[in-house]
UniProtKB/Swiss-Prot annotation:
GO MF entry, a single one: FMN binding
Protein name per Swiss-Prot or TrEMBL: FMN-dependent NADH:quinone oxidoreductase
Co-factor binding comment: Binds 1 FMN per subunit.
The reaction(s) this protein catalyses: 2 a quinone + NADH + H(+) = 2 a 1,4-benzosemiquinone + NAD(+); N,N-dimethyl-1,4-phenylenediamine + anthranilate + 2 NAD(+) = 2-(4-dimethylaminophenyl)diazenylbenzoate + 2 NADH + 2 H(+)
Key word NAD present: yes
Binding site for FMN: 10, 16-18, 93-96, 137-140
Biological role: Quinone reductase that provides resistance to thiol-specific stress caused by electrophilic quinones. Also exhibits azoreductase activity. Catalyzes the reductive cleavage of the azo bond in aromatic azo compounds to the corresponding amines.
Protein's UniProt keywords contain Oxidoreductase: yes
Highest classification ranks of the organism: Bacteria, Pseudomonadati, Pseudomonadota, Gammaproteobacteria, Alteromonadales
Listed cofactors: FMN
UniProt KW keywords: Flavoprotein, FMN, NAD, Oxidoreductase
């Protein structure tokens, strides 16, 4: 059995290509095959990291209600991440970057002493055994170009927390006509299926 943590972050609801790819993937797994934890970060947005929450993460001794709730939520999200075998992130590109909704999740799980630590040798990720797949959808073509601020950032922050086994599924040119869009979405479906099948096989053998 594989433990999935799936994150959606599109603001487009039922019209979202990235969310549909995740839905199609998860629908292939029965309760006997996978434990699935799923968050729609746009439909149920997380709190934005602000000064109060940041101070609570540094000095949790005296907290107000807002800080206490934020830390409890952060602990819960981190527990889900640590327990996962596979993290699947659906990340549509907005203005060359990830959605704000996804950034809010990152800000709550990237915590010193919880998912990374500072050592004499430099930062060290504390998460082990979690693999990640980034599913990115774009209207144009940005793969391996300077306009892609999205994938490099996600890889950096995941590596920082100790998640280094990362695959990326690209669905690009989705605004360049329906035929092109469907062709690229179908390629993304196949690639996503291959990656998850490989990871499921490795997990069952471990």
């Amino acid at each position: 059995m594989i433990n999935f943590l799936a994150l959606k972050s599109s603001i487009l609801g039922d019209y979202s290509s990235s969310s549909k790819l995740i839905d199609e993937l998860l629908a292939k797994y029965t309760p006997q095959q996978a434990i699935i934890t799923e968050h729609d970060l746009a439909e149920q947005p997380l709190p934005v990291l602000d000064g109060e929450i940041a101070m609570a993460m540094r000095s949790p001794e005296q907290l107000n209600d807002k800080q206490r709730d934020a830390l409890a939520l952060s602990d819960k999200l981190i527990s889900e991440l640590v327990a996962s075998d596979l993290l699947v992130i659906a990340a549509p590109m907005y203005n060359f970057m990830i959605p704000t909704q996804l950034k809010n999740w990152i800000d709550l799980v990237a915590r010193a002493g919880k998912t990374f630590s500072y050592t004499e040798q430099g930062p060290q990720g504390l998460i082990s055994g979690t693999r990640a797949i980034i599913v990115t959808t774009r209207g144009g073509m940005h793969k391996e170009q300077g306009t892609d601020q999205q994938v490099p950032y996600l890889k950096t922050v995941l590596n920082f927390m100790g998640i280094s086994d990362i695959e990326v599924v690209y669905a690009e040119s989705l605004a360049m006509g329906p035929e092109t869009a469907e062709l690229n979405l179908e390629q993304a479906r196949k690639q996503l299926s291959v990656f998850t099948n490989d990871i499921s096989t490795l997990n069952s053998q471990s």
